Each structure stands twice: as structure tokens, then as C-alpha cells.
Swiss-Prot record:
GO terms for cellular component: cytoplasm. This is ATP phosphoribosyltransferase regulatory subunit. Signal peptide: none annotated. Its main location: cytoplasm. Coiled coil: none annotated. Required for the first step of histidine biosynthesis. May allow the feedback regulation of ATP phosphoribosyltransferase activity by histidine. GO terms for molecular function: histidine-tRNA ligase activity. Belongs to the class-II aminoacyl-tRNA synthetase family. HisZ subfamily. It comes from the Bacteria. NCBIfam families: PRK12293.1 (NF008946). Keywords: Amino-acid biosynthesis, Cytoplasm, Histidine biosynthesis.
Length: 286
């Protein structure tokens, strides 16, 4: 039998105290002020929900237990899913508000605790508006991570019209992509607005509309560190079109985009508070 010492906490759970706890509170306060100003209201969803309300009831990631009536209960695993369900199914007659934010953790198997600050604009697929709010939050913290703009529809369409499987784009197997259709190599070279405009005029017609959506998203965004990644693909539970993320090194600090859930097209993002705290503390110590 393995002896568990009194000072140990489960791997993947989070502990903040002193300087780190103060930083966490400062991040949350600044984000909430910006979100309130942008017309969002806060929602705090239950930590528990019925297992049948999860997108994938068989997922090993979901922590589950039973209540006194033997109903299967899940510990909060996806706040976006909960917000959409609760606003549309439970509070639909009580509020017409459609812009909501949350500051709370999600949990996954075995003992992972992930603190998030998220915002959802239900029934509004305005990615540019959401992106500007995300940028403002980082600027309030005097941070400018790299901003990546992508469109999940582009690799999906490329896989459909080429000999390549979607996994080639998910793993970003550059050699296979370059050895395939010429336009795929061109898409790989896109980094800035000039590249995007040049390549859009040369690609097959089935891609032009999706590339135009990327151009429209970037137009008017004043941010010094952003790149286009039109072939970026990461399997997501619901993001299937315009997608953006902000990262530094190997750490993703925020991700978001347009999604459809319960026949409602919406847009949102999630800021990963734990990653952000770690980055700021390391920078201050360095």
C-alpha cells in the first residue's frame, strides 16, 4: 500500500497562496471589469450536472458519481456546454440576455483541476467582437502573447478535396502536405495579410470564401503579434469554423471561436488562468 503523506495533494489539482493567489484574483478582477463593460453578465453554473447532459456520456475524462436516487452525476467538465444548456433550457423565460461570462474551474479524470475565465455570446457569431475583448484583457495585464487566426473549415475542405486524410493536418505533417497539391504548399506559407491576399487569388474556388472570412476577421484588429495559420486543425468538441488562440511558447493561454450548439450559432473563448499565472510568475522571477 502506497503511503500518502500529509502535505501531498492529488496530481493535477491546483494550490494558490500568497503571491500566486493575489495574482489570480487580480487577473479575475481585471477580466471581469472588461467583460462587464463589454455588456457581459456573470453566470456561476453548478459544479454538478446530470451525466446525460454531457456531450459524450462515455468519455473517460468525465468524473462521475451517483446521487441518492442512483442518478449518474458528472463533476463540471465543460462550462460552455453548461452555459448554453442552462440559458436556453432553464433560464430562457427569465432572461433575454445573451452575453455571459464565468470564472470557475472545470475538472477531468483523474484529478485535473483547470481554472478558466470564459465568455460566451449566444446566438451571435461575431468572432471579431470577442477577439477584441480577449485582446483587451491581455493588454490590461500588460501582456501580448502571439495571436493565431485560423479557420477549421479550411483543413476540413482540403482533406475532402485532396488525397490527404484529416490526421495529416491535425499532426501538421508538412512534408506530406508539401508533396500534395500545389495550393496546399501556398497555404502553408501564409503568415500575414499580404500573404493571405496573394494566395486567396490562386487557390481553388472552394477555399476562397473561407479564406475571405479569415481576412475579414483580421481587418481592423490592431495587434502587433498575430499570424495566420489557415491549415491549423485541432479536433474540438464544437469549434468547427473561425478559431483563434493566444499562446506563448508551448503554452496556450486562450482559445476561442465560432461554434454551433443546440442549433444556436454562437461565439466564445476560454482563458486558461493556471497557464497565465505560471507564465507571469516565471517572467517576474526571470
Amino acid at each position: 500500500m502506497v503511503v500518502i503523506l500529509e502535505h501531498e495533494i492529488p496530481q493535477g489539482s491546483q494550490l494558490y497562496f500568497g503571491k500566486s493567489a493575489r495574482l489570480k484574483r487580480r487577473i479575475e478582477e481585471r477580466a471581469s471589469q472588461i467583460l462587464y463593460t463589454a455588456g457581459f453578465e456573470e453566470i456561476i453554473t453548478p459544479s454538478f450536472s446530470f451525466l446525460e447532459h454531457q456531450r459524450d456520456t462515455s468519455s473517460r475524462e468525465v468524473l462521475r458519481l451517483s446521487n441518492e436516487k442512483n442518478h449518474q452525476i458528472a463533476l463540471r467538465n465543460d462550462t460552455t456546454l453548461d452555459v448554453v444548456r442552462i440559458i436556453t433550457k432553464r433560464l430562457g423565460r427569465s432572461t433575454e440576455h445573451r452575453r455571459w461570462f464565468y470564472i470557475q474551474p472545470v475538472f477531468s479524470y483523474p484529478t485535473n483541476e483547470i481554472h478558466q475565465i470564459g465568455a460566451e455570446s449566444l446566438g451571435e457569431a461575431d468572432a471579431k467582437s470577442m477577439l477584441k475583448v480577449a485582446i483587451e484583457i491581455f493588454r490590461s495585464l500588460e501582456l501580448e502573447p502571439i495571436l493565431q487566426l485560423s479557420n477549421m473549415r479550411i483543413p476540413l475542405l482540403c482533406a475532402e478535396h485532396s488525397r490527404l486524410g484529416l490526421e495529416v493536418f491535425a499532426k501538421m505533417q508538412v512534408e506530406k502536405i508539401m508533396a500534395s497539391e500545389e495550393y496546399l504548399g501556398e497555404l502553408l506559407q501564409i503568415k500575414n495579410a499580404q500573404d493571405l491576399q496573394r494566395v486567396t487569388s490562386k487557390v481553388p474556388s472552394f477555399l476562397k470564401e473561407e479564406l475571405e472570412k479569415l481576412r475579414a476577421l483580421a481587418e481592423g484588429i490592431e495587434y502587433p503579434r498575430f499570424v495566420f495559420a489557415p491549415l491549423y486543425y485541432a479536433p474540438m468538441d464544437y469549434y468547427n469554423g473561425i478559431f483563434f488562440r493566444m499562446f506563448e511558447g508551448n503554452s496556450t493561454l486562450l482559445s476561442g471561436g465560432i461554434y454551433e450548439m443546440d442549433e444556436l450559432q454562437s461565439c466564445g473563448f476560454g482563458l486558461y488562468t493556471d497557464q497565465l499565472i505560471e507564465k507571469i510568475l516565471r517572467h517576474n522571477e526571470g
